[in-house]
Regions:
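An aromatic- and glycine-enriched ligand-binding surface/loop that stacks and positions planar moieties
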Residues: 1-8, 28, 32, 83-103, ...
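Conserved, well-structured interaction surfaces
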Residues: 6-81, 116-126, 136-147
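Residue-level recognition of alpha-helical structural elements
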Residues: 55-60, 150, 177, 181-184
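Aromatic- and acidic-residue-enriched carbohydrate-binding clefts of CAZyme catalytic domains
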Residues: 102-110
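General structural signal for secondary-structure boundaries
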Residues: 109, 119-122, 153-156
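Surface-exposed, gly/pro-biased binding rims or lids
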Residues: 113
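Short helix/loop segment immediately N-terminal to the Walker
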Residues: 142-151, 175-177
């Protein structure tokens, strides 16, 4: 199908026996990062265009939903979490250096100068940003019915909120602007129910 003779099997660099691609400095580590940021760039372009256009609320809501989706995945992929491994002092030191950090945020109005010094943001700052995008999208898409299945509806927005709160429920740290622990789990259940209904 499609001229790909390997359509029904893993590519060589994904075989477990060839784990060099899976190392921290291997091919797979930047794969998601690079592709998600390409999608974020496109969402930012759409947001920028919507900001300059009359009647582009739906485009803005769709773009903010997709951007929130990307950052939610990136935050979960690159949030350094403790692993159960044999004693490795270097691992513990490296973990402490990035504990609670996710990925850099690139907004539609981020300048090139800001990009040159754009460090990883805290988990709290990232999820605050994600919820800002989802809340805006929820308002803008309140009366929107997607024309195709690849565009977000309110159910998608509620589902993304449920996923975000479910992730935050696994943390015991207290944040001023986003819930964690049981409070986050309750919100995850609430938004999951909204997505289903």
């Amino acid at each position: 199908p499609g001229g790909n003779q390997y359509y029904d099997r893993w590519q060589a660099w994904l075989y477990p026996g060839n784990s060099t691609g899976l190392a921290a400095n291997g091919k797979m580590s930047p794969f998601f990062y690079t592709n998600y940021y390409k999608f974020i760039f496109t969402a930012n372009e759409a947001i920028d265009i919507a900001n300059q256009s009359e009647g582009a609320e739906e485009m803005m809501g769709i773009a903010k939903t997709f951007r929130a989706l990307c950052y939610l995945d990136l935050a979960r992929l690159y949030d350094a979490l403790p692993a159960k491994a044999p004693e490795r002092p270097a691992y513990e030191t490296e973990l402490e250096a990035v504990k609670g950090l996710t990925v850099p945020i690139v907004r539609e109005d981020t300048s090139m100068e800001e990009l040159e010094n754009n460090p990883r943001v805290s988990r709290e700052e990232m999820f605050k940003f994600i919820f800002e995008d989802l809340n805006t999208a929820e308002t803008l898409l309140a009366n929107y019915t997607p024309a195709t299945k690849n565009l977000p509806s309110l159910a998608v927005i509620y589902g993304l909120k449920a996923r975000a709160y479910l992730w935050l429920g696994g943390f015991t740290e207290s944040y001023a602007e986003v819930p964690t622990g049981d409070a986050a789990y309750r919100l995850a259940a609430e938004y999951a129910r909204k997505a289903i209904d």
